[in-house]
Amino acid sequence: MGLDLKALVSREPTRLESFATKVVAIDAYNAIYQFLATIRGPDGMQLTDARGRVTSHLSGLLYRNASFLSMGIKPVYVFDGRPPTLKSAEIERRRNVKKGAAVKYAAAVDAGNMDDARKYAQQTTSMRDGMVDDSKQILKLFGIPYIDAPSEGEATAAYLTQTGDAYASASQDFDSVLFGAKRLVRNFTNSGRRKIPNRNMYVDVQPEIIETEKTLTTLDLTREQLVDVGILIGTDFNPDGFERIGPKTALKLVHEHGRLEDIPRIQDELGSVSYAEIRKIFLEPESPGNIEIEFGATDYDGITKYLVGERSFSEDRVAAALNRLRRALEKRSQNLDQWF
């Protein structure tokens, strides 16, 4: 579901180039889901290799990471660990949404409505066995580090910004702000030209950055209070939120009363919400321990052998992407040498 803080946080447009030389901790599952949902054929079906295995995520990781490295960006991918018990309701909700979308997809295909078919196909997106291993394999070949979080990937990505190991975390979800990320970048892995569903129109999706401290100052809230605002709206750990409370009402209530326990109108509902545990998930997430981030060299031959030889990618397209990366890195190296 993700947290609906869009109307409240302070967002500023930015450019990918502004992250050159900076480490960005990417919510891996969030990025991979985006690739799986958007990189599809005209009928809405995902790309596959000769054995029928999905390759949409690998295509996204190839082109996006080649672009990142070409610009001098240092991506680090953070994979989810075991989900908190409180997330089970949200996981079940997502499962039901996908089942319903699958039925609608089949009906749209039968009716010959390919726009609807593609829309519903995207809603069926799920992470299947092997996709995480596939993703880690291509990251290794690029020399890009990845981290297995003990629980929520966004929490560990936020932790990396707190320790100074990363400049920002990257995710479409606003949960990173509640987890304490110093900076959150949205549209980081899906920026560019995108088609508007059911319309023959395209938009340019631009990255945007959210400074958590600026957001807290603008809203006149502590981080603890912002977590309470999130709980009122609804998080992955209480997806229904509170009845008839949206972002602006939640902010007003916390301003007036300070904390959940002191808001009169929600007391009947509050007893059925594990709000103390949800607070702890955001404010005291499980520690990832000592993390060492090491970047390696790109294995151009290894990427080609894996994607072309094992996953049925076009040799010409892979070569073109890697050649662009090689030329960009050579140019950056030459420019750097001029300073010495």
From Swiss-Prot:
Leader sequence segment: none
- List keywords of the entry alphabetically: DNA damage, DNA repair, DNA replication, Endonuclease, Exonuclease, Hydrolase, Magnesium, Metal-binding, Nuclease
Chain sites annotated for binding Mg(2+) 1: D27, D80, E152, E154
* Cofactor or coenzyme needed: Mg(2+)
CDD domains from the UniProt entry = H3TH_FEN1-Arc (cd09903), PIN_FEN1 (cd09867)
Assembly, per entry: Interacts with PCNA. PCNA stimulates the nuclease activity without altering cleavage specificity.
Name the chain's protein: Flap endonuclease 1
Q: What is the lineage of its organism?
A: Archaea, Nitrososphaerota, Candidatus Cenarchaeales, Candidatus Cenarchaeaceae, Candidatus Cenarchaeum
